[in-house]
Design a protein with these regions (language model features):
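Bacterial N-terminal signal peptides
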Residues: 8-18
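Short solvent-exposed beta->alpha transition segments
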Residues: 35-36, 50-97, 111
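Exposed beta-sheet edge and beta->alpha loop/turn motif
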Residues: 91-143
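Structured segments of extracytoplasmic/periplasmic soluble domains
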Residues: 40-48, 56-60, 125
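Short, low-complexity N-terminal intrinsically disordered segments enriched in polar/charged residues
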Residues: 19-47
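Bacterial N-terminal signal peptides that target proteins for export
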Residues: 1-8
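Short, structurally constrained coil/turn elements
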Residues: 13-15, 74, 79, 129
Length: 143
């Protein structure tokens, strides 16, 4: 009887450990996807593919307003010269992430470089249609 109890206990412990490892691996994968998404989005903004950034990463409900802002930014001649990711926080268990980015930019006809801080809120979708990170905040005002 004692022997059976030990085997059952060992089985339960091993099962719990394997579940914990599987969850940790899933969270690691979600973190890697977050890193890729937030870097990809900001890189597209940097290289003036604002519409592509919005269509790829933005929540569909926010796209119309985003595209209007993108059009306004292009009309005003705003050019992003550099960006720095100041902080990024990914919370896989809550399926949320937050990024603080600093952009250096100028708006024609001025050649003066300005700096803007942009706080981005992200959420992770895990549905049959789509898995991945979506941006929940629109473009900042490039004054």
């Amino acid at each position: 009887m004692k022997q059976l109890y030990r085997y059952v206990l060992m089985f339960v412990v091993l099962t719990l450990c394997s579940c914990a490892l599987a969850l940790q691996a899933k969270h690691s994968s979600i973190r890697e996807d977050f890193e890729k998404s937030m870097k990809g989005y900001n890189k597209l903004l940097r290289w003036r593919d604002i519409e592509g950034a919005g269509m790829t990463y933005l929540d569909p409900e926010l796209r119309d307003a985003f595209l209007k802002s993108a059009e306004d930014i292009k009309k005003r001649g705003v050019t992003i010269t550099d960006y720095r990711i100041l902080t990024s926080e990914c919370l896989p268990e809550k399926k949320t992430g937050e990024v603080v980015v600093e952009f250096d930019y100028y708006a024609l006809p001025s050649n003066r470089i300005k700096t803007l801080t942009y706080r981005q809120k992200w959420s992770y979708l895990d549905t049959e249609e789509k898995k991945g990170w979506q941006l929940k905040t629109g473009l900042p005002p490039f004054d």
